C-alpha cells in the first residue's frame, strides 16, 4: 500500500447555517478543514496509507481537530503538539449571484509560529512514497517557507514523488511574495496542480482568450500554460482544473492533465454541477489525482477519476470528500444520473 504524507494547516471552520450571511446569523456550524488535510482524508477513504503533518495546540480544540481526521483513518501520529491557537476561517456560503466569502483568523496559529526544528522530516518520511503540500502553507510566513523547503529536501532524499497545488490566496500574501517562494519550492515538485487562474497569479502565465469572471475559458489555451509551467520547472505532470462559474450554485467543471514524457494533453469530460459546498473541491481533485497516479492509471483515466471525485465533493457539506473508489469510478464511467440506489 502506498504511503502519502501531506503537510499544512488544519483549521476550525465556522459557518452560518444554510445560506445566512454573517451579519444575520445567530449560530454557526463547527467543523475542520485545510487543503492538505482534505487531500489526506480523500486518500484514506480510497484505502491508502495517508498521514497528515502539522502543529496543533494540546488543548481540547486542537484535539477535536485531530479527531476529525482520525475518524476517516488518517494517520495523525506525526502531528506536533504545541502552541496556543488553532487557525480559524469563517465561511459564508454564497447563493445564486452572491459569491461565498471567506474570512481568515489564523494569525499566531500553532503552525504559523512553528519552527523548522519542530519537525523530524527524516522520521516523517520513513517508508513514504509521496509528499503533498499546497501554496497556502508557505503563505503563512517565512518560517513556514523554510519548513516546506526542508520537507521537500527530505522527501527527495527518501525517494518520494512530490506534488504541489499552487492554491494562490491573495489574503495571505502578495503575488510577488508568492512568486519568490513558489519559484524556490517548485524546483522540488514532480506534479504541479493549478486552477484556471493560479498560474497567472503566481507566475504570470495565463491562457489566451479566456474570461474567467465571465465564465468563459479557452481550454486549448491551457495547453500552453501547462507546457510553460513544465518547461520552467521540469515538472513530470501538470494538472489544471477548469471551473466555469455561472453562479454560486452552477458551475461547469473539468480538467486537463499534461503528461510531459508522453507529450499527452488529456482533457476530462465536463460536469455541469449544482453545488452544495465548493470548499475543498480542488483538494478532492488533488486527492483523486494522487490516488490515480499511485494506482498506475494512464493519463486519461487519471484525470477522469480526479475530476469525477471532485464533482462528487461539490455535493457534500464540509471540507472533506467522503466518497469511495467505487462511487468515483461509477461516475467517471458515465453514471451521473443521481438515481436512488436500492
What residue spans do the PLM features occupy?
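Conserved phosphate/ATP/ADP-binding segment of small-molecule kinases
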Residues: 172-261
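Alpha-helix C-terminal capping segments
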Residues: 31, 39-49, 292-295
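Short catalytic helix/loop segments, enriched in acidic residues and glycine
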Residues: 21-39
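Positively charged, low-complexity intrinsically disordered leader regions
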Residues: 1-21
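Conserved post-catalytic alpha-helical subdomain immediately downstream of the catalytic base
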Residues: 265-335
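A short helix->loop->beta-strand "cap" motif at the edges of active sites that frequently abuts
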Residues: 154-161, 233-236
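Conserved N-terminal subdomain of the carbohydrate kinase-like
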Residues: 49-136, 328-342
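Histidine-anchored nucleotide/phosphate-binding helix
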Residues: 35-45, 148-154
Amino acid at each position: 500500500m502506498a504511503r502519502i504524507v501531506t503537510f499544512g494547516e488544519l483549521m476550525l471552520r465556522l459557518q452560518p447555517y444554510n445560506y445566512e450571511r454573517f451579519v444575520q446569523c445567530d449560530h454557526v456550524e463547527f467543523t475542520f478543514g485545510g487543503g492538505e488535510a482534505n487531500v489526506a482524508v480523500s486518500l484514506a477513504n480510497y484505502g491508502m496509507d495517508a498521514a497528515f503533518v502539522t502543529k496543533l495546540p494540546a488543548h481540547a480544540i486542537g484535539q477535536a481537530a485531530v479527531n476529525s481526521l482520525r475518524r476517516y483513518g488518517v494517520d495523525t501520529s506525526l502531528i506536533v503538539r504545541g502552541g496556543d491557537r488553532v487557525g480559524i476561517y469563517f465561511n459564508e456560503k454564497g447563493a445564486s449571484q452572491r459569491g461565498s466569502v471567506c474570512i481568515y483568523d489564523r494569525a499566531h496559529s500553532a503552525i504559523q509560529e512553528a519552527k523548522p526544528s519542530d519537525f523530524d522530516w527524516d522520521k516523517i518520511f520513513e517508508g513514504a512514497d509521496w509528499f503533498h503540500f499546497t501554496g497556502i502553507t508557505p503563505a503563512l510566513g517565512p518560517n513556514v517557507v523554510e519548513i516546506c523547503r526542508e520537507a521537500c529536501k527530505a522527501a527527495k532524499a527518501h525517494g518520494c514523488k512530490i506534488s504541489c497545488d499552487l492554491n494562490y490566496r491573495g489574503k495571505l500574501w502578495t503575488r510577488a511574495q508568492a512568486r519568490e517562494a513558489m519559484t524556490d519550492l517548485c524546483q522540488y515538485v514532480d506534479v504541479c496542480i493549478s486552477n484556471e487562474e493560479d498560474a497567472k497569479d503566481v507566475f504570470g502565465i495565463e491562457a489566451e482568450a479566456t474570461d474567467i469572471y465571465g465564465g468563459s475559458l479557452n481550454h486549448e489555451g491551457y495547453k500552453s500554460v501547462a507546457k510553460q509551467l513544465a518547461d520552467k520547472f521540469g515538472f513530470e505532470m501538470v494538472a489544471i482544473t477548469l471551473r466555469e462559474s455561472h453562479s454560486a450554485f452552477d458551475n461547469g467543471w473539468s480538467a486537463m492533465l499534461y503528461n510531459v514524457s508522453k507529450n499527452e494533453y488529456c482533457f476530462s469530460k465536463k460536469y455541469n454541477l449544482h453545488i452544495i459546498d465548493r470548499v475543498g473541491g480542488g483538494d478532492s481533485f488533488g486527492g483523486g489525482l494522487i490516488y490515480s497516479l499511485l494506482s498506475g492509471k494512464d493519463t486519461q483515466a487519471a484525470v477522469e477519476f480526479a475530476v469525477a471525485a471532485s464533482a462528487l465533493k461539490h455535493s457534500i457539506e464540509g471540507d472533506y470528500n467522503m466518497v469511495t473508489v467505487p462511487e468515483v469510478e461509477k461516475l467517471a464511467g458515465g453514471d451521473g444520473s443521481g438515481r436512488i440506489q436500492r
